Amino acid sequence: ARSREPVKVKKALPEQCSLLEDLGYLVCDASQEDLIVTVPTEISKVFHQLEREGYTERKTRYDLLDGYAMATVHLYGAISQPDLVDIFNRQNSQPTSEEELFPALLRHVAVGAPYCFWEEYIVCGEFEENGFEDVRDLMRQCGGKPRYIPEKDDLLRYADWNYYERTPQMDALTAFLMNEGHQPRRDAEEIAGEIQYACVIEADMEQIYDILGDYDMELDGSAVEAFVKVMMSVKNNTRLWAN
């Protein structure tokens, strides 16, 4: 919207523009070698008005707050709003407050963020499935244990819901899935990520085998024994929500 001229986009990525085009925010011309994208004048005017009113700064700020919510829920499963404010303020020069945090995150919850609010907590949205009973269990297990709080850049890596800590044990699991499970690297890493998450929430082995089943992956007798050995190593070296 800042550009006064049409912008060229590689045709290999047209899906990035399709929703905005359907909404009327973009006009796309695919008749040439590159996809030519233009913002209608009316939309451009609205954008520049929002920009003058500080919209881009607010969005950057709210996206950072969302990143902290995503990262801490991914890392801990649940976190109280005061605790999230405390972590944010320790790592940023411009402090936040619960009064700013709640409405900012509510905007992200409204459009499908993987976390939600429960009492004073921000929690993984999956807890809603059983009426948040598992949150209560998690809080009891955590008690007053000190939290592992990475430095800002390391913490915000967890804002990517597919991110997991690369450890020798996870590398061994990925290699096993490729070599014994005959999975391509991309699928092996995806399966490993799902298994790592299952370990974080302390899922049992039956649930982990269900993950393999979702990918139509079967193991024979000797491979099953080797898989259990690899899995025990992963489980013993995974940071749990309850820790």
Each language-model region and where it sits:
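Short amphipathic alpha-helical interface segments
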Residues: 1-13, 65-89
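Short amphipathic alpha-helical interaction segments
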Residues: 7-28, 94-104
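Accessory beta->alpha helical hairpin/"wing" motif in late/C-terminal subdomains of nucleic-acid enzymes
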Residues: 27-55, 115-137
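Short alpha-helical segments that sit at the start of domains
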Residues: 47-67, 163-169, 182-184
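Protein-protein interaction regions
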Residues: 60-62, 94-103, 114-118
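Contiguous interface-forming segments/domains that mediate binding rather than catalysis
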Residues: 67, 82, 86-89, 96-111
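Long, charge-rich, low-complexity intrinsically disordered regions
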Residues: 102, 111-231
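Cys/His-clustered metal-coordination modules, chiefly Zn-binding fingers
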Residues: 242-243
